[in-house]
Every structure is written in structure tokens, then in C-alpha cells.
Design a protein with these regions (language model features):
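Phosphate-binding/catalytic loop of phosphoryl-transfer enzymes
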Residues: 1-41, 48-49, 167
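ATP-binding/phosphotransfer module of carbohydrate and carboxylate kinases, centering on a glycine-rich
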Residues: 35-168
Length: 168
């Protein structure tokens, strides 16, 4: 379960990556969730891109001054900056991330409930913060069906920005 600019959930069966008919299987970011009666892609709700967009919107409205200062100093917005501001206790950044991870947890639960894996590997800069890992576990397990909560192990791997490129 890989979260970056988008959300992917590559599927492996034994030691083989499962491929779809025309492309790779597991593009969970392109699946939809109903939010207040409106259908939205998981990428638009829980990806780093979604978090960036909400933070940028808040900065344009004059909020998140600490994040804006960091962004201007670095010349660009990065997930690491957002996480630093989150760890400093910024309520709005915490709310943005909490909501995004809530959607990611629902998406992950959908995958688990569909394929019933023995374990899931979660990888994201977002999960380098312990409370974000706990939030994902809470959101996912709260939507697991039956025994999945006890049976499915979610493993958080140390984040490596280039893991996707190395795997390709």
C-alpha cells in the first residue's frame, strides 16, 4: 500500500506481481469513495497530492503561516515540511492529514475485504510519523470485515523515496 503523489496497492501472489489485462493491478488511487453523496477518487482524497492541495488552499487563505514560511525558504512544498508542522502540533495540518488518512484507511479496508491477504506492506513518507501509522490502522481496522482485524498484519516499511523507481 504505497502513498505518494498517488495511491497504489500492487498485488503479489506468492512471489509474482499480479498484472491486469492492460496494465498493473492494484491502482487503488483510481477507485472511488462516496463523500457526502459525491464520488471522488482515492487519489483526490488521501494522496500526498491531496494533502498538498488542501495545505496550499489554506496558505492562500492566509492560514498555516509556519508551513508557508518553510515553503518559501525551500522554494517548494514538500511532504517533509508538512509533517514537521504536524509534529509541532498545528491543528489545521493535523486535521488535513487525519482526514486524508481516514480515507486511506477506508481504501485499504476495501482491498483487505476484497482479497483477504495475510499481510499488507504500507509505505509512505506520511507513515514516518507514528500517530499517522496508528490513524491508518484505526481507520482500516474499523472497516475490516469479520476476522480480518485479527488475521491481517499491516507492516510499515521504512520510507524510501526511490523504492518505486528501484522496483520498476
Amino acid at each position: 500500500f504505497f502513498v505518494s503523489r498517488g495511491v497504489a496497492c500492487p498485488l503479489m501472489l506468492k512471489e509474482d506481481v499480479v498484472s491486469g489485462y492492460t496494465a498493473g493491478a492494484g491502482e487503488i488511487g483510481h477507485t472511488v469513495l462516496s463523500v457526502n453523496g459525491e464520488l471522488k477518487c482515492v487519489d483526490d482524497l488521501g494522496s500526498e497530492g491531496a494533502i498538498f492541495a488542501k495545505c496550499q488552499e489554506a496558505m492562500l487563505a492566509g492560514r498555516l503561516p509556519e508551513l508557508k514560511e518553510r515553503m518559501q525558504k525551500e522554494g517548494h512544498l514538500a511532504m517533509e515540511q508538512i509533517l514537521e508542522v504536524q509534529m509541532q502540533g498545528d491543528d489545521e495540518v493535523n486535521a488535513i492529514i487525519d482526514q486524508a488518512i481516514g480515507y486511506l484507511g477506508i481504501a485499504l479496508a476495501n482491498v483487505v475485504n476484497l482479497i483477504n491477504p495475510g499481510y499488507v506492506v504500507a509505505d509512505s513518507c506520511l507513515f514516518s510519523v507514528e500517530k499517522n501509522r496508528q490513524r491508518l490502522l484505526e481507520a482500516a481496522k474499523g472497516n475490516f470485515f469479520g476476522l480480518n482485524e485479527e488475521e491481517v498484519q499491516i507492516v510499515f516499511t521504512p520510507f524510501d523515496r526511490f523504492r518505486g523507481a528501484k522496483g520498476a
